[in-house]
Amino acid sequence: MAEELKEKRELEVEEDNTKKDNSDKKSKVKRRRRNYDDLDAEVTKDEKSRKTKSGKSGKNGSDSESEVDDAKLDTMISLEDEQEDDLAEIDTSNIIVTGRRTRGKIIDYKKAAEELAAEGKISLDEDEDEDDEDAKEDDGEFDE
């Protein structure tokens, strides 16, 4: 037993040493923080050079760009207006007023419902009857 305990302790000590080695590696490898100051300086230089170029031409860069964008938008809007359909060409006789599409066949729904009721295929309040029966069955199940 004593030998087994010694072996276990030796293994534990070895595991602890490996953990320490891993933590040392992590601390030795320092992460460098990115330095964006150089990039910021380059960007500001580019912006200044653009402003001086646009200043020499006599226009501000932002104004000329916005004017170009406005012109593009105006042309796009005019193209959309040309592409829109003319509503005067629509024949109003083809518009369905009832709200139900029947593919050109005119159906009197009241008459059709009466005919079906007379034939006994459906009752006029069929949906309500089914709901009431379901409710009665459900109530009976839970009364126990």
From Swiss-Prot:
Residues 125-144 have a biased composition (Acidic residues). GO terms for molecular function: histone binding. Disulfide bonds: none annotated. GO terms for biological process: chromatin remodeling. Its main location: nucleus. Keywords: Chaperone, Nucleus. GO terms for cellular component: nucleus. SMART domains: CHZ (SM01082). Residues 1-26 have a biased composition (Basic and acidic residues). It is found in: Nucleus. Residues 1-85, 117-144 are annotated as: Disordered. Belongs to the CHZ1 family. Forms a chaperone-bound H2A.Z-H2B complex that acts as a source for SWR1 complex-dependent H2A to H2A.Z histone replacement in chromatin. Forms a heterotrimer with H2A.Z-H2B, stabilizing the association of the histone dimer. Also, with a lower affinity, forms a heterotrimer with H2A-H2B. This is Histone H2A.Z-specific chaperone CHZ1.
